[in-house]
Amino acid sequence: MGSSPPKKTTLQRYLSQLQQHPLRTKAITAGVLSGVSDVVSQKLSGIQKIQLRRVLLKVIFAGGFLGPAGHFFHTYLDKFFKGKKDTQTVAKKVILEQLTLSPLNHLLFMIYYGVVIERTPWTLVRERIKKTYPTVQLTAWTFFPVVGWINYKYVPLHFRVILHSLVAFFWGIFLTLRARSMTLALAKAK
């Protein structure tokens, strides 16, 4: 009797999918991590019944935009800088990411969260963004450059979006709790 090939572990299957279908795998990973992050943040913020619509909308945003945007951004940077990982090149990559993709991601998330998830009128969302976006972005700049440095210096290209998605898991909890506290503060002020 012939022996059957050993079964692949979940990690091996995931890595195989990442190799064969990198964009799809990164998009799904970003979406799943964003959804789980939102469930955790809802529980931490005291919501008794999970708001599935909100979770699904955050999965759609992360899977439809954040994962693919990260995939293409990191791929482009690696091609542009020819895969170099010297200190000067890593610094350039971090600066480029922090001055382009990071502000864009945060701005689009805040717009999406207000208009689509909360169904808040655009004029109110715009006012909220004017008040809170600078603080959110400045806070991101206190630790995301370190994440970027680690990512560009030590993490292979095909894992960079995954690492970023894992960090974004916690960042998403922070942003959600911050957005909720700002909404409550605005409601109390009225």
From Swiss-Prot:
A GO cellular-component term linked to this record: peroxisomal membrane
UniProt protein name: Peroxisomal membrane protein PMP22
Ranges per topology, Peroxisomal matrix: 76-96, 153-154
InterPro entries: Mpv17_PMP22
Domain of life: Eukaryota
Gene name in the database record: PMP22
Membrane-protein topology: Multi-pass membrane protein
Localization of this protein: Peroxisome membrane
Stretches that traverse the bilayer: 55-75, 97-117, 132-152, 155-175
Family: Belongs to the peroxisomal membrane protein PXMP2/4 family.
Lineage of source species: Eukaryota, Viridiplantae, Streptophyta, Embryophyta, Tracheophyta
Organism: Arabidopsis thaliana (Mouse-ear cress)
